[in-house]
From Swiss-Prot:
This is Ribosomal RNA small subunit methyltransferase G. Belongs to the methyltransferase superfamily. RNA methyltransferase RsmG family. It is found in: Cytoplasm. It comes from Rickettsia rickettsii (strain Sheila Smith). It is an enzyme of class 2 (transferase). It holds the Pfam family GidB.
């Protein structure tokens, strides 16, 4: 993946900030710190190839360490809203957002309570599809969802299809053999 030097430098600053804060609040697993660039930065950054127009509003739910939201903002997404219920993580996200030159909004609320419109919704290491779809009832997603999923992605799709209508594409993760990027569109709840 070709990444401009200026973006790499900002992502390295972000990486240092996460490592520093991870000592006091659990942002990422200690087991992944040694492989942070591959496991977290590239895993998040790979979503940029599925964002055709960076002049959009992207919402990242359960933002925690800013993955993928902060990374995508640094990579050029014009407007990013990060939804995180944990106040300590929101304080971290506020500091991390200063690394990006783009508009980053931190929303310290439970996802179910947030009313917002966006073009794209992302999340990583958050929950299964049914839980994600249920908790975003007040979020209007105009274009698509980009969801970083693990080995249980097919089971999640089958279970979600029992309650929801949606189209989807499955993309292979570039960072993990078991990892997938689930691109979801046209989400509608069944009656």
């Amino acid at each position: 993946m070709e990444v401009p030097r200026e973006i790499i430098e900002k992502l390295e600053i972000f990486q240092k900030l996460v490592k520093k804060w991870n000592k006091s609040i659990n942002l990422v697993s200690d087991n992944t710190i040694h492989n942070f660039w591959q496991r977290h930065i590239l895993d998040s950054l790979q979503l940029i190839q599925y964002i055709d127009n960076k002049e959009i509003h992207l919402v990242d739910i359960g933002s925690g360490a800013g993955l993928p939201g902060i990374v995508l903002s640094i990579a050029g997404v014009a407007q990013v809203s990060l939804i995180e219920a944990d106040l300590r993580k929101c304080i971290f996200l506020e500091k991390a957002s200063k690394i990006s030159n783009n508009n980053v909004q931190i929303i310290n609320q439970r996802i179910e309570k947030v009313e917002i419109d966006c073009s794209i919704l992302t999340c990583r290491a958050f929950s299964n599809l049914n839980t994600i779809f249920n908790c975003i009832k007040n979020i209007s997603v105009r274009e698509k969802f980009l969801l970083l999923k693990g080995k249980n992605y097919l089971t999640e799709i089958v279970e979600a299809k029992e309650r929801w209508l949606f189209g989807y594409l499955i993309h292979q993760s570039i960072t993990c053999e078991e990892g997938k990027i689930l691109e979801v569109s046209n989400l509608t709840k069944m009656i």
